[in-house]
From Swiss-Prot:
InterPro entries: GIY-YIG_endonuc (IPR000305), GIY-YIG_endonuc_sf (IPR035901), GIY-YIG_UvrC_Cho (IPR047296), Hlx-hairpin-Hlx_DNA-bd_motif (IPR003583), RuvA_2-like (IPR010994), UVR_dom (IPR001943), UVR_dom_sf (IPR036876), UvrABC_protein_C (IPR050066)
Protein name: UvrABC system protein C
Gene that this sequence comes from: uvrC
UniProt GO BP: nucleotide-excision repair; SOS response
Cited HAMAP family: UvrC (MF_00203)
SUPFAM superfamilies, alphabetized: C-terminal UvrC-binding domain of UvrB (SSF46600), GIY-YIG endonuclease (SSF82771), RuvA domain 2-like (SSF47781)
GO molecular function, one term: excinuclease ABC activity
CC terms in the record's Gene Ontology section: cytoplasm; excinuclease repair complex
Keywords from the UniProt entry: Cytoplasm, DNA damage, DNA excision, DNA repair, Excision nuclease, SOS response
Length: 647
């Protein structure tokens, strides 16, 4: 482990201007990015008294092997550069406020010809407008059920839309007037887009004009004695008002603001944000992240600065701003305290928004009351997380310690990798590699392998496949370790940058012996290898005649089972995907002269391979670009035992 004194720069060589600095580990990877008003003052504080640094910061300084910096002209430039570097390098010691994929949102796919309303979980995408997040998916479905009476926009999937377009018949929602049925041409793209725009306006807070419009239409229908239409409009108005009641007015002046609050202990920070648009709370979002203190920074001020820079930087990049209410950066951001560079932050946020953004601490009135509510939510979230953290941490620590003691390892296996092979009778043979760090899955390091040498033509050798995956994984690790030219100048991690402490194979003695032999051939002696057999959950050690038996109720065996089962799940998922692609594409792939474009045209025209198989030559030639010879070849490929293709 590097000694901070070995790479500490001379104080006089560090500039006093503002700038951004990067710490790198011995492999050249960027592990931390920070900024400072004075680079000299900030960097000197890292090395002045390492023992008194925050534990996470102290760990970073002792792992690092190099520090470098870039001087900028202003603090706004430093803020922007810091955000860009954190996004690019994903340093392991920086706090990351990633998109919370657990909360559902109401998504509107504005980038499509006929936009769709749907419940969505996952990372934000361009061309999609989001409302929420909501606490439960049923709350979104209930809102959609109410509002599609008034705004009958499409809610179906692309597959359902295409199918009903082909059969020229709307779905049930089209028959009960909860969808305008653009699939069958009841409305055109322009009319449907206007329905969606009205829906978005309503959810953005422009509610009153739609309620007044329905009341006016209802009165007009009653005056014309069209009581049936008046009754429908009455029901629509009732649905609209019910949807409005679900979003309580917190500010009567139509405020657009985000209210941010933090709760933290020595290790982690809980962040809560309430999104207020048009005076109504439109969504809530929360994170739990590890705490990381820079020397010389006040705790909460640093949290505010880091959160604003990362959260709004990412939101502004991901959202298309079609109108004022859709802007991801609100007019006002309410925070518990102002950082020292509040003016620079407000200026940067204003640049993202395109108009002035106010950064304030609420002191009194409704805004103060809402800020206190958000603060209570953050405290409650942290308290619940601490209870879960204590339980999870204790069980994970016990499991890792138990594995170390049982297997006689020098260190607890903080990084565990597991490999599994999946196939069906020797076809589509694939391998998977999953990674667990500190007892938790690290999905960004998962890898798939297509087996090249140990399988093919209907044959499969699990032992040889395990050996092939092991060899490919550790050969890449040796390249990363020994060939410095393979390290990117930006310090990005390679695919297999970190070796495991424990390498687990799914299988018994033959599989574990094969993996161990490969490591021995490669000269790797610091990685422990075991096999976990499914039948009796036995732990096999290389070249030992008998397995190690762990207690059935031990935390160690439970963790190893989780790792093995995750590798199996990952391998099965990839195998099924590969098999599905082969089975659906192979029939038309064999037709000579039929390229990808015309294959797609055929499937689009007929809707499925089954319908194409039942078609005649004349029907197939109706597809643009398909002649008689090609149509005949298609039928011969799909119906090799039928004589119709030659008729």
């Amino acid at each position: 482990m590097p000694d901070p004194a070995t790479y500490r720069p001379a104080t006089g060589s560090i500039p006093v201007e503002p700038g951004v600095y990067r710490f790198r580990d011995p492999y050249g990877r960027v592990i931390y990015v920070g900024k400072a008003k004075s680079l000299r003052s900030r960097l000197a504080s890292y090395f002045a008294d390492v023992a008194n640094l925050h534990p996470r910061t102290r760990q970073m300084v002792t792992i690092a092997a190099k520090v470098e910096w870039t001087v900028v002209n202003t603090e706004v430039e430093a803020l922007q550069l810091e955000y860009n570097w954190i996004k690019e390098f994903d340093p392991r010691f920086n706090i990351r406020y990633r998109d919370d994929k657990s909360y559902p949102v109401l998504a509107v796919t504005l980038g499509e010809e006929f936009p769709r309303l749907m419940v969505y979980r996952g990372p934000r995408r361009k061309g999609v407008r989001y409302f929420g997040p909501y606490s439960h998916a049923w709350a979104i479905r209930e809102t959609l059920d109410l509002l599609t009476r008034v705004f009958p926009a499409r809610t179906c999937s692309p597959g359902v839309f295409k199918r009903h377009k082909q059969i020229d018949r709307p779905c049930l929602l089209g028959y009960i007037d909860k969808c305008a049925a653009p699939c069958v041409g009841r409305v055109g793209a322009e009319q449907h887009s206007q329905i969606v725009a009205d829906f978005c306006d309503f959810l953005s807070g422009k509610t009153d004009r739609y309620a007044r419009d329905l009341e006016r239409k209802m009165s007009a229908a009653a005056e014309q004695l069209d009581f049936e239409r008046a009754a429908r409009l009455r029901d629509d108005l009732f649905a609209l008002k019910r949807a409005m009641e679900k979003q309580a007015v917190v500010f009567g002046d139509g405020t657009d603001a985000d209210v941010v609050a933090f709760a933290y202990d020595e290790l982690e920070v809980a962040v809560q944000v309430f999104h207020v648009r048009g005076g109504r709370v439109r969504g809530q979002r929360g994170w739990i992240v590890e705490k990381s203190d820079d020397p010389g920074d006040t705790g909460e001020e640093q949290l505010v600065e880091q959160f604003l820079a990362q959260f709004y930087g990412e939101q502004a990049e991901l959202d298309f701003v079609a109108d004022e209410s859709a802007n991801p950066v609100p007019r006002e951001v309410l925070v518990p305290c102002l950082p020292s560079n509040a003016d620079e932050l407000a200026s940067w946020l204003s640049g993202l928004r395109g108009s002035r953004v106010a950064l304030r601490v609420p002191r009194r009135g409704d805004k103060r009351a809402l800020a206190e509510t958000v603060q209570r939510n953050a405290k409650e979230e942290l308290q619940q997380h601490k209870l879960k953290r204590a339980s999870d941490f204790n069980s994970r620590s016990a499991a890792l310690q138990n594995i170390q003691d049982t297997l006689g390892l020098s260190y607890a296996p903080l990084r565990i990798e597991c490999v599994d092979i999946s196939h069906v009778q020797g076809t589509d043979v694939v391998g998977s590699l999953v990674v667990f760090e500190d007892g938790l899955p690290r999905k960004s390091d998962y890898r798939h392998f297509g087996i090249r040498k140990a399988a093919g033509n209907g044959r499969s050798d699990d032992v040889a496949s395990i050996a092939e995956v092991t060899r490919r994984r550790f050969l890449q690790h040796l390249h990363d370790q020994n060939d410095t030219n393979l390290l990117s100048p930006e310090g990005k991690s390679h695919r297999f940058a970190y070796p495991p402490n424990l390498y687990v194979v799914d299988g018994g003695a033959p599989q574990v012996n094969a993996a161990s032999t490969v490591l021995e051939e490669l000269g790797i002696i610091d990685v422990a290898v075991i096999g976990l057999a499914k039948r009796l959950e036995e732990v096999w050690v290389p070249f030992e005649p008998y397995p190690v038996i762990m207690p059935r109720n031990s935390e160690a065996l439970f963790l190893l089972q989780r790792v093995r089962d995750e590798a199996h799940r990952f391998a099965i998922t990839y195998h099924r995907s590969k098999r599905s692609k082969r089975m659906t594409a192979s029939a038309l792939d064999s037709v000579p002269g039929l390229g990808a474009h015309r294959r797609k045209a055929l499937v689009t025209h007929f809707g499925s391979i089954a319908r194409l198989k039942d078609a005649t030559v004349e029907q197939i030639t109706a597809v643009p670009g398909i002649g008689v010879a090609t149509a005949t070849a298609v039928l011969e490929a799909l119906r090799p035992d039928s004589s119709e293709a030659s008729e």
